[in-house]
Amino acid sequence: MIESNLKKYFQLETLNVSRETFPALEEFRSLLISENKKTNLIGRSTEKDSVNRHIIDSAQIIDIIDNNSKLCIDLGSGAGLPGVVLAIIFKKRGSNIKFDLYEKSLKKSNFLRKIIKHFELNAEVKQKNKLNQQINRERLNKKTYNRLSTNY
């Protein structure tokens, strides 16, 4: 792990993310940057500051996810942001929350499947554009949905 990146991860402690989670997040970030050379997953200009721009930004919503939830849905998951980052964090916490990652792009879906298998995450890729279908609101984490809808 690059020392400068390790220091950046310490910001996650304010979000109650344990230090033991940092290596897995850094490994995901490294795999993301590597795959980004072949498949456009994130903007090239954001690669240099990807710890802040992608990992820490994704982790910032962990407090709005109810720990008792059974399912968390990431619509338009793309590079797995925030879904994969959250799945890694919740796995390290010992949580059983399942993450459904909806992504319409075959290339991005294949990347997500590789990541899920690599980290043995409680997650599944649904390769479809869920935004064009009616969302089954009963399946959504109601606490998260309600907090998001009242904040915007």
Report the location of each language-model feature.
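Class I SAM-dependent transferase core
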Residues: 2-69, 107, 111-121
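Conserved SAM/SAH cofactor-binding pocket of Class I
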Residues: 59-152
